């Protein structure tokens, strides 16, 4: 059963497009297209895992261009009875970065008693199309004090991103248009009901320890714990359907009966 069943991704929560950008043809605006990715899914089987996640699934990229990860919506569901103890910390990671504190883009903590949760991350930075084809993002998951036999799946996570795809940097930059970003370090959101152990160790330290134990390339195999359909992002050579210079593609997202929060980063 898909976790993401209804509602819509609200692009305006992440991007503030001017009226001029909506009217002008794409050749006169730095925005080539604004779109939402398809849903990528991770089934968590281990208490601590570092998994590949395709945040640009279904996004049409431009050859020799750029893609800005403007926003990310993460939905999680516990596959557990209501009275279970313990909790989880989820962290978005840029695997290109060598320093663990710079690799962590946003962290979120919640208890197993929350059957369903949802949070938003605002990475707000661009990478080249060439880097994007290498799937540079990972998810670090740390489950604590959830007593389940090995081989079963206590937690499911789904990811949908809002992206801006464009060809050149020479025109006025896009990043000052991104909303919900403020100065300061990455924010880590914590539910009051989460056990104290969740707040003791920052996720950047957990990532550094995990990398030192397993090696940076030792991540969860895609075929075992993540979705089977992990195709590379598609390249777009200029034939996307535009609406006044922008293309909009939306996925459905759950938006009722769930716990929703925002995690922010200071990347500019």
Curated annotation (Swiss-Prot):
Keywords: Host cell junction, Host cytoplasm, Host cytoskeleton, Host-virus interaction, RNA-binding, Transport, Viral movement protein. Transmembrane segments: none annotated. GO terms for molecular function: double-stranded DNA binding; RNA binding. InterPro entries: TMV_movement, Viral_movement. Residues 259-268 have a biased composition (Polar residues). GO terms for cellular component: host cell cytoplasm; host cell plasmodesma; host cytoskeleton. Pfam families: MP (PF01107). The keyword Ribosomal protein does not apply. It comes from the Viruses. Residues 217-268 are annotated as: Disordered. Binds to host RBCS at the plasmodesmata; this interaction seems required for viral systemic movement. In resistant plants, interacts with host MBP2C at host microtubules; this interaction prevents virus cell to cell movement. In resistant plants, interacts with host resistance (R) protein (e.g. tomato ToMV resistance protein TM-2(2), AC Q71BG9) at the host plasma membrane; this interaction triggers host defense responses leading to programmed cell death. Transports viral genome to neighboring plant cells directly through plasmosdesmata, without any budding. The movement protein allows efficient cell to cell propagation, by bypassing the host cell wall barrier. Forms a ribonucleoprotein complex with viral RNA. Binds microtubules and modulates microtubule stability. Can bind double-stranded DNA. Triggers host hypersensitive defense reaction in incompatible plants harboring resistance (R) proteins. Belongs to the tobamovirus movement protein family. This is Movement protein. It comes from Tobacco mosaic virus (strain Rakkyo) (TMV-R). The gene is MP.
